[in-house]
């Protein structure tokens, strides 16, 4: 990690330092493991009681916890946000590529901006446009007429199909495939006929996509991922899906075709969203949610049975299977009571 002075940390975070600004830190560490030379943070107040024992060179805290610190304190509005900014500043992760490798295969008409880097054995097909500071890792494939905006970075073995576009400042992790065919077939008396997928995928600015995620191209119109969306690992985004500004989706989630997800949504991991539905802005769905119909109002939604012991779960499952029978018996009892009241 890059070394920084406490004065530099204060500038990066916009915080107020109480202590020696000349001291240097070279690592970010959890509060219970931090040592001299480390910077740490307190985001959960329940751990404030441990501040007096913390050995870090500096702790990033809210103002109400400053006096509990054993040493230097950096007072910030949000310690977790400050932590994120400090890690960004200290990050020394290598780039996917540093220059244009001799083994890269690049079509003669590819338009490249300044400071483009392309790793070994990457293939860049005809008509591709690469913005300034684009970095393409080893073994990537960029199909015909695809476009990558300024500062966009692809790690090794990413596949970008033909005519797909990514905006500025995007990050795509290894193994992800963008623009493969959507799942479109017509059935002619038992024979499946493939429907060519003629749309594409349009991805906005500052979008991050995790490893081994798949985003299908649209059937006729485009699949759309708006600005500031974050998609985790191993997601399946089907054809013609639209994902609104600032939405986040953890790993394992599946979104069926033509579903529209609003702005600032949070979709819990391993959730499944049915096709041709609409999710309103600001909806949060807890993990393993099964969304079968549209959600029209902002709020928190859940489905599924929380973890139980196997014995408890078997009892619950048995009761669930008996609900229809119990409902019939309840209606019969209600009818008998109504008859008694009438008599």
UniProtKB/Swiss-Prot annotation:
It catalyses: a UDP-3-O-[(3R)-3-hydroxyacyl]-alpha-D-glucosamine + a (3R)-hydroxyacyl-[ACP] = a UDP-2-N,3-O-bis[(3R)-3-hydroxyacyl]-alpha-D-glucosamine + holo-[ACP] + H(+). One of its GO terms (biological process) is lipid A biosynthetic process. Signal peptide: none annotated. GO terms for cellular component: membrane. Pfam families: Hexapep, LpxD. One of its GO terms (molecular function) is N-acyltransferase activity. Its EC number is 2.3.1.191. The active site is at residue 239. Pathway: Bacterial outer membrane biogenesis; LPS lipid A biosynthesis. It comes from the Bacteria. Keywords: Acyltransferase, Lipid A biosynthesis, Lipid biosynthesis, Lipid metabolism, Repeat, Transferase. Catalyzes the N-acylation of UDP-3-O-acylglucosamine using 3-hydroxyacyl-ACP as the acyl donor. Is involved in the biosynthesis of lipid A, a phosphorylated glycolipid that anchors the lipopolysaccharide to the outer membrane of the cell. NCBIfam families: lipid_A_lpxD, PRK00892.1. Homotrimer. HAMAP family: LpxD. Belongs to the transferase hexapeptide repeat family. LpxD subfamily. This is UDP-3-O-acylglucosamine N-acyltransferase. It comes from Vibrio parahaemolyticus serotype O3:K6 (strain RIMD 2210633).
């Amino acid at each position: 990690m890059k070394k920084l002075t406490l004065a530099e940390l204060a500038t990066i975070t916009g915080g107020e330092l109480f202590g020696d600004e000349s001291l240097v830190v070279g690592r970010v560490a959890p509060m219970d493991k931090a040592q001299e030379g480390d910077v740490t943070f307190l985001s959960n107040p329940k751990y404030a009681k441990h501040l007096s024992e913390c050995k870090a060179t500096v702790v990033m805290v809210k103002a109400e916890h400053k006096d509990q610190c054993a040493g230097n304190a950096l007072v910030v509005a949000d310690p977790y946000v400050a932590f994120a900014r400090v890690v960004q500043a200290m990050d020394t992760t290598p780039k996917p590529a540093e220059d244009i490798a001799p083994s890269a295969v690049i079509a003669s008409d590819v338009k490249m901006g300044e400071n483009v880097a392309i790793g070994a054995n990457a293939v860049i097909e005809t008509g591709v446009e690469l913005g300034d500071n684009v970095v393409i890792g080893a073994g990537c494939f960029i199909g015909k007429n695809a476009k990558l905006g300024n500062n966009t970075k692809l790690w090794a073995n990413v596949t970008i199909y033909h005519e797909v576009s990514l905006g500025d400042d995007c990050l795509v992790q290894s193994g992800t495939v963008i623009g493969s065919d959507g799942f479109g077939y017509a059935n002619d008396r038992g024979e499946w006929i493939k429907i060519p997928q003629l749309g594409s995928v349009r991805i906005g600015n500052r979008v991050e996509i995790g490893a081994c995620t798949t985003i299908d191209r649209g059937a006729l119109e485009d699949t759309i991922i708006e600005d500031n969306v974050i998609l985790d690992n191993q997601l399946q985004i089907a054809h013609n899906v639209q994902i609104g500004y600032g939405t986040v989706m953890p790993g394992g989630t599946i979104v069926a075709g033509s579903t529209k997800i609003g702005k600032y949504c949070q979709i819990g991991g391993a959730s499944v969203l049915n096709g041709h539905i609409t999710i309103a802005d600001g909806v949060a769905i807890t993990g393993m949610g099964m969304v079968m119909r549209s959600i029209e109002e902002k709020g928190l939604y859940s489905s599924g049975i929380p973890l139980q012991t196997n014995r408890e779960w078997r009892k619950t499952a048995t009761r669930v299977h008996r609900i229809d029978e119990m409902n019939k018996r309840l209606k019969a009892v209600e009818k008998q009571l109504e008859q008694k009241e009438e008599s």
